[in-house]
Amino acid sequence: MRWQGSSRRKATGGKVITARGKRKFEMGRESAETRISEIKRKKVPTMGGNRKVRLLQSNVANVTNPKDGKTVTAPIETVIDNTANKHYVRRNILTKGSVIRTSMGTARVTSRPGQDGVVNAVLIE
């Protein structure tokens, strides 16, 4: 689990004396690490009774051509580049900003698959 509360260190490097401990709502969750395979989603309860859809696996993306504004569902072939982590390329993990090869051409992922539950991408030259 990840802790998403404030740091115990000040900007100067000194320790902050906290008046309380950690709280459960400050805990994070493990990342979804969406892979290229048959579509698999998972619904996760969030604060306020809401839900978040995690995309665990996907083999299609909604690819938009910026020249004509048309959006087409295209199969994903592979991950070409990922600025989030260089090891995600060989593991074919999709994150926002990753460059993928589709049947329409090379595209950059614009959605957050682990939080949105869908892969949206824009064609790049």
From Swiss-Prot:
GO terms for biological process: maturation of SSU-rRNA from tricistronic rRNA transcript (SSU-rRNA, 5.8S rRNA, LSU-rRNA); translation. GO terms for cellular component: cytosolic small ribosomal subunit. GO terms for molecular function: structural constituent of ribosome. The keyword Ion transport does not apply. PANTHER family: 40S RIBOSOMAL PROTEIN S8. Part of the 30S ribosomal subunit. Belongs to the eukaryotic ribosomal protein eS8 family. This is Small ribosomal subunit protein eS8. It comes from Methanosarcina acetivorans (strain ATCC 35395 / DSM 2834 / JCM 12185 / C2A).
